[in-house]
Amino acid sequence: MFTKRHRITLLFNANKAYDRQVVEGVGEYLQASQSEWDIFIEEDFRARIDKIKDWLGDGVIADFDDKQIEQALADVDVPIVGVGGSYHLAESYPPVHYIATDNYALVESAFLHLKEKGVNRFAFYGLPESSGKRWATEREYVFRQLVAEEKYRGVVYQGLETAPENWQHAQNRLADWLQTLPPQTGIIAVTDARARHILQVCEHLHIPVPEKLCVIGIDNEELTRYLSRVALSSVAQGARQMGYQAAKLLHRLLDKEEMPLQRILVPPVRVIERRSTDYRSLTDPAVIQAMHYIRNHACKGIKVDQVLDAVGISRSNLEKRFKEEVGETIHAMIHAEKLEKARSLLISTHLVDQ
């Protein structure tokens, strides 16, 4: 005879890193608390809401950034904990217990990271309002607020939603915008995926990153990191902690604990600094070009002569200018780049030589 176990439904499109981490956080709570829950989640980790009220079980943890899920759960008579982004207006929150990623803290972390690097021009690459991504609208709002408070000039480009049929057009428009930005601008992208668009366009336009433009994303999405030549700095969300807190709160609701409507904001974990914001305040065009060449080719066995050929000036001239701007010789910088690349690979990859 089976003892009574709570049946819990998770409604997430866990084909995305953020959603997967929330689900992992739920699992971590189950392991820590030894809760006897039967978890239902679709085998392909996609949220399906057809006839949802017929199979919800005893409680729900759901992605309330998804408007369709939020609407489908209206008037459902089981305990619900919503998970999603924070809002600057209290009335924007859904009328359920809610665990939120702190959008203000996410954008502020990226902004402060760029400031610490010496950047004093800022831009934001978001998503169009037609995308329906409310968290993107909130992050853009935070960016505008931060640059206004700090008396900086901030530029916003929402861009286009991308699909195979409009990909090249969207990238061309992004290229047009990037070419209007002054050198030494720091760009905060609303997600890592949008940041990758920027890195691709910069590579095509031969805009050196981070020497001329710095780029930072949000999500710390590993897949994006491996798909870009320039390693992307990113703000890691506290998604696992969100899942953990959501499960903990649902447990209290299942135990019939009386409480007011809960809204819990979860801060980001930290900024993961990588090459895309490894900014040095360089002003000499020849040194900027040399640094960019070294960063992209140091591990290909290049020597000082190859750097000179790429820049097109004499050794004595470039060595003098390089020493004045960077404080190192060209040879020393090539060696330092090799060591940094090796260190980064040791930390971040899991490849085994068979």
Question: Where in this protein do the model-derived segments appear?
Answer:
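Key DNA-contact positions within bacterial/archaeal DNA-binding proteins
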Residues: S316
